[in-house]
Amino acid sequence: MKLSGLDFDEIVIPLRQADSRTEILKYSPSAKLPALIDGAVTVWESMGIIEYLAEKCPDAGLWPKAPAERAWARAVASEMHGGFIPLRRALPMNMRRQIPGIELNDLVQGDINRIQAIWREAQRSHANACGEGPYLLGEFSALDAMFAPIVSRFTTHEIPLEEGAIAYMDAVNAHPLMVEWCEAA
């Protein structure tokens, strides 16, 4: 949301509480977060929200302007959104502490390898699709926002990665929106 430049009010709903689902259902018909309410429009799921914001704020640079670059970024964001289940199960998000030493099975290592391959491809072939910068498409974009939870997991669990992946993670972890997200955790 913040990347779009739109003003908004954030409603924080504590999770894992007896009334969490009831509270979430007030804003999201799927009972999942995040959700965006813009007047009479309700959008849930990260990808739906990003697409809505990209259409509403076309100059925000959420996606590349070139169709081929935009299609690649959307495909990778969708892969990130719906994939890497073994990694998500093995490496839970926890921005409050470090949890090194988790043993990685072949499925998790396969996810890590695929993510690094995506990041290498972005840095090699798509690095200036959204301007110049250290992020996947140059400037920080929706694609980096989609990978922020993975960056958080890799950071929390001190996953050994390639040099280019570490440099990318350092850039994401230093981005003001990521710093703000971590501080709010």
Protein language model features and the residues they cover:
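GST-like fold's C-terminal all-alpha helical module
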Residues: 82-174
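GST-like domain detector, emphasizing the conserved glutathione-binding G-site
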Residues: 2-103
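Conserved hydrophobic residues forming the short capping helix/wall of the S-adenosyl-L-methionine
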Residues: 1, 54, 119, 123
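Short, thiol/selenol-centered motifs that function as redox-active sites or metal-ligating centers
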Residues: 1, 73, 144-145, 175
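Exported/periplasmic ABC-transporter solute-binding proteins
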Residues: 184-185
